[in-house]
């Protein structure tokens, strides 16, 4: 068992099984369909986890996110998906893609169930040096209580907004309007788009290293998308990688300034409804920034 599963078992959880993921948690899809419409994708990479919760096979499920692999499937399947702050949940024993970008997340149908499970797995783990100590002992009381203050939100309308389908854009704008004075619309800094490039460099470079033995020995059996990502990752140099990693701290500090005046950032979870067919699991672009920065998403 990986550390997360061990913690759940020791807390009395009944582990029902292993859900389907995309190949090595990348873009080559499995056979899982969307429980609301079997002609559509459930998203990826945590396809089976989102579908299992949405179809009432399980009240909660575990997934992982290196780009948009928890938030996007949750959106497509109509359940709650939570990707915590980097370092809150151990990745020990989980199939690795990128030590810098990998997060373990949780799916559920209610905030109460989400909190109930999360409090058991947010723990510092000496086997995963990225983890930190953080107390969540009072989380059940917090989720059941009303906010102690009037929350203020910020919405960044980035260049990615143009990729949102018309109906989703219309619905999200109506949602923003409904919040009224509780939300402020701000243009993202011009350097915002650079984050997507940096994330790709780290992601693909790390995959090229992590999966090198599979690529060298079993390339013919690997999916096309994974092979292409590994080959792109092998072309980046040390300077590219160092810049992408160092810039992460710079951008993180920039975003922390936002929270001097606002409590949360609002953004779409996906580019729209789940795409037709199973080959394409959808775009992760509305999660990329928060995964790169290690910021929590729900």
Regions found by a protein language model. Name each.
Residues 2, 164-189, 212-217, 241, ...:
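Acyltransferase
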Residues 66-92:
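Glycine/threonine-rich beta-strand-loop-alpha-helix active-site module
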Residues 83-169:
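A short helix-breaking turn/cap at a secondary-structure junction
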Residues 147-152, 156, 198-256:
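Short helix-loop capping/hinge segments that flank enzyme active sites or metal/cofactor-binding pockets
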């Amino acid at each position: 068992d990986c550390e997360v599963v061990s913690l759940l078992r020791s807390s009395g959880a009944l582990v029902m099984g292993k859900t389907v993921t995309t190949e090595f948690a990348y873009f080559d899809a499995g056979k899982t369909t969307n429980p609301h419409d079997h002609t559509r994708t459930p998203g990826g990479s945590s396809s089976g986890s989102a579908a299992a919760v949405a179809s009432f096979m399980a009240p909660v499920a575990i997934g992982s996110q290196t780009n948009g692999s928890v938030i996007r499937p949750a959106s497509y399947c109509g359940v709650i998906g939570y990707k915590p702050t980097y370092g809150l949940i151990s990745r020990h024993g989980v199939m690795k893609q990128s030590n810098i970008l990998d997060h373990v997340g949780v799916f559920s149908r209610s905030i109460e169930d989400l909190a109930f499970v999360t409090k058991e797995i947010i723990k510092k783990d000496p086997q995963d040096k990225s983890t930190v100590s953080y107390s969540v002992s009072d989380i059940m009381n917090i989720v059941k209580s009303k906010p102690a203050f009037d929350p203020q939100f910020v919405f960044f309308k980035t260049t990615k907004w143009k990729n949102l389908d018309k109906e989703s854009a219309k619905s999200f704008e109506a949602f923003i309007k409904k919040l009224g004075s509780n939300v402020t619309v701000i243009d993202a800094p011009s350097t915002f788009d650079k984050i997507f490039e940096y994330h790709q460099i780290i992601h693909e470079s790390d995959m090229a290293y992590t999966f090198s033995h599979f690529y060298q020995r079993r390339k013919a059996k690997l999916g096309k998308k994974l092979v292409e990502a590994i080959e792109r990752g092998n072309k980046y140099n040390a300077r590219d990688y160092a810049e992408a990693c160092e810039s992460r701290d710079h951008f993180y500090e920039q975003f922390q300034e936002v929270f001097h005046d606002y409590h949360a950032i609002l953004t779409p979870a996906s580019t729209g409804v789940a795409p037709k067919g199973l080959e394409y699991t959808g775009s992760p672009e509305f999660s990329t920034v928060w995964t790169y920065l290690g910021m929590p998403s729900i």
